[in-house]
Amino acid sequence: MRETPKKVLVIGSGPIKIAEAAEFDYSGSQALKALKEEGIETVLVNSNVATVQTSKKFADKLYMLPVVWWAVEKVIEKERPDGIMIGFGGQTALNVGVDLHKKGVLQKYNVKVLGTQIDGIEKALSREKFRETMIENNLPVPPSLSARSEEEAIKNAKIVGYPVMVRVSFNLGGRGSMVAWTEEDLKKNIRRALSQSYIGEVLLEKYLYHWIELEYEVMRDKKGNSAVIACIENLDPMGVHTGESTVVAPCQTLDNLEYQNMRTYTIEVARSINLIGECNVQFALNPRGYEYYIIETNPRMSRSSALASKATGYPLAYVSAKLALGYELHEVINKVSGRTCACFEPSLDYIVTKIPRWDLSKFENVDQSLATEMMSVGEVMSIGRSFEESLQKAIRMLDIGEPGVVGGKVYESNMSKEEALKYLKERRPYWFLYAAKAFKEGATINEVYEVTGINEFFLNKIKGLVDFYETLRKLKEIDKETLKLAKKLGFSDEQISKALNKSTEYVRKIRYETNTIPVVKLIDTLAGEWPAVTNYMYLTYNGTEDDIEFSQGNKLLIIGAGGFRIGVSVEFDWSVVSLMEAGSKYFDEVAVLNYNPETVSTDWDIARKLYFDEISVERVLDLIKKEKFRYVATFSGGQIGNSIAKELEENGVRLLGTSGSSVDIAENREKFSKLLDKLGISQPDWISATSLGEIKKFANEVGFPVLVRPSYVLSGSSMKIAYSEEELYEYVRRATEISPKYPVVISKYIENAIEAEIDGVSDGNKVLGITLEHIEEAGVHSGDATMSIPFRKLSENNVNRMRENVLNIARELNIKGPFNVQFVVKENTPYIIELNLRASRSMPFSSKAKGINLINESMKAIFDGLDFSEDYYEPPSKYWAVKSAQFSWSQLRGAYPFLGPEMKSTGEAASFGVTFYDALLKSWLSSMPNRIPNKNGIALVYGNKNLDYLKDTADNLTRFGLTVYSISELPLQDIETIDKMKAEELVRAKKVEIIVTDGYLKKFDYNIRRTAVDYNIPIILNGRLGYEVSKAFLNYDSLTFFEISEYGGGI
């Protein structure tokens, strides 16, 4: 008999960080849906304001609080749930669940853990317990020993024998893990590894050099029935974190014996931890014989399970939630197929490729080599019917300016064979580009295998693409058969046109004349063997007919956000999903085009039709040819839609909302600056970078510092503050590289100004706007800034002038839909610095803070007009809301932590409060590794900017109970100083509770900042924020823990 709980608490994962991203928005949303179907009341704790999950429609009650045990205890005390789900919020949620269990909170309030129990979680996540469990069950694991101290680690590594893989228990994204080739390597890094473990434990394991890494996804119910859902093959060998690896599904190089043996072991691993729900099991396979080891398991929804779910069409998170409620596999219907029960193992008639997306160029000093720690910030997934087609599509999806395996910047560079092999040996990101270059320059398969350990099967495929492309280049014209073969191998129109030295339009014309167009295929989990009710599709040239009939009517295609990177994250998926829902009121059919496996928008039951495919002019035009969409919406998915808007419009596509020509004016720095001059709106002095002579003259006239700003970029890519001529010339060179087709603008950088923004919606005549004020001064990228609603320091007069400016721009550009305007305010003058004619990164926050969905309002503005009498309307604020940035410094090996005009954060959290400090502190505490400092500990406060704020910060921290030191080389008035060496020593000894600093001081304090983030010590990189947070510490006892609607927020 199944006992259904009446109220269930679901723990989210908090803000997006490297290794814990939007996959938990997807999995948590599915879990909440599964609970709702059962009539169960749901309560969600999650501080990630950007997610779809933290919209009211998913959970009955939402608490936007730090995802830590003491905050969750307050919710349990108030809500009294019967059950708790901790398997849908990543490692963060599991850690909270274990803490609540150990501290007796679950027992005290009689809350039952649903799904895999705590002892099973501990068996899986403690490296020592996992090893013991596997050995007890006669399951093969590599030779290894655990350790809980530096001395024990050094002793046990000698027993295991070098090289050793250091694995970290209860850990996220391999943080702190490494391969130690010698004792010296181990001694240098073992303290950091132990610091990154939630329980202070590591495993020293024999390093399996160049072994193949594989993952299996398994479902298991309370009766022990199991179904293996996917086998995923990592192309990168052991030693590269699976989140950093290019992977394919189904596995391509296993024989039946290998596949079946590991499948059996997977089921045994699930049984040994008494899994209820879903887990993934990772294996190492000897490429030269039938020898395999079990490496680890994650007893929760994970990045891999999100990928497996999207790759197979099997709704893992939904089914897992049902199993946690006590269902058996045969009782749950697979909602994607609509025909089969959850015990059916999927069958695939296509190949899926996942490639991670890195943004390492944004960080100074970061280690560029891929290793055991995850550094990628997002991923893409492509679907094709040949490996070549799937791989080339995935490379284009990365949006890194490469058209596929061949024909791009790397392939056409002057790099020699030796240089390409060197990059491959160093494990640089996007290895397939260097492999293709090496083959082009004459490298053999064996030479590339020796430096990479990548299976020869895949290397042969890449070499085949190189050979085909070189043959293509020798042709003057292309015949129908060669063109069809090229398309089947995944070549884009752009690649083919480059090879033939023709235009893209020429290739498209021949394609249409020869009827060489892709066909639409369904993902149904059943390889077409059973009829299915799915709406989940992709396009391929390896097919002869479409799997669907295309409907007529008033139809909308929404362009998704693509793969996440710094600057494009889950907030744009929120916009896409909001637009889907709003659009269904105005269109007969709404479809979405996206290729991110982590997101809610690519879930099977969100869109009427989901096209899991490339976002490009070529693909959109192909889809319009088939589907006859009346409109295409490019404004909800971040920069990627805006980048193709103008070209789509030039090809006859009707854009929803603001015109492509208006978007071009906003995105092109020179055109936008001229528009502001025409309207008489204040902006910093500027010049378009046409010659070095003019730039030099301008800089001398306005004085340094100046800001270098490329066009059509996101997250401040290559945006730099230049303090000298030398820096100016270097930054202009970089900016023209990143955005060569568009002008680079140099403007006067206004120091010590307040930065503010308006998120808004217009119908071309009226404006609905929300004002956000930054705590940090102008010069810190808005994506890294802490934001407050309502504003605090701006005067009403300034805000009214900002609103007036916005209204004038909206009317001049005939803005129809969402937009965001950024201002700097100095001496009572607001200066406009940027306009984005699309949904903004802050829109989920501003919408939830005010209780009004700006994307829904956008659709009303476009079709019905805004329905208020004023020209400009801002909804009133009922309470305070504060948004904080989440940084992932600890994952980015070697990176120097500092803030500037280029974005560095990976996610965001928000909280609400009855006072500004109530909201600020909960918001700040929601970002890892921030915590309330232990009184009687040490704080370091120093810097070369915002010195008055740093001094006041030091005073506040002293009042809080900390011993505060400044550094003698950068003293603060009346604050005790220590020298730099002593400061480093205190940080390494983990005696420092918090660091507050400001300014770019890499030559001086690199070791202090880097060691702090390696050891999980909270660090605040701005004096103004440090002051406000330190003041909030003094009000710690008055924090409130209300449900979001009690603060008047939520949508």
From Swiss-Prot:
Residues reported to bind Mn(2+) 3: Q822, E834
Gene Ontology cellular component annotations, sorted alphabetically: cytoplasm
Sequence positions that bind ATP 1: R127, R167, G173, G174, K206, L208, E213, G239, V240, H241, Q282, E296
Region of interest: Allosteric domain: 931-1051
The protein, known as: Carbamoyl phosphate synthase large chain
Gene designation: carB
Keywords in alphabetical order: Amino-acid biosynthesis, Arginine biosynthesis, ATP-binding, Ligase, Magnesium, Manganese, Metal-binding, Nucleotide-binding, Pyrimidine biosynthesis, Repeat
Binding site for Mg(2+) 1: Q282, E296
Pfam families membership: CPSase_L_D2, CPSase_L_D3
Family: Belongs to the CarB family.
Domain of life: Archaea
Annotated Mn(2+) 4 binding sites: E834, N836
Domain MGS-like residues, every copy: 930-1051
Upper taxonomic lineage: Archaea, Thermoproteota, Thermoprotei, Sulfolobales, Sulfolobaceae
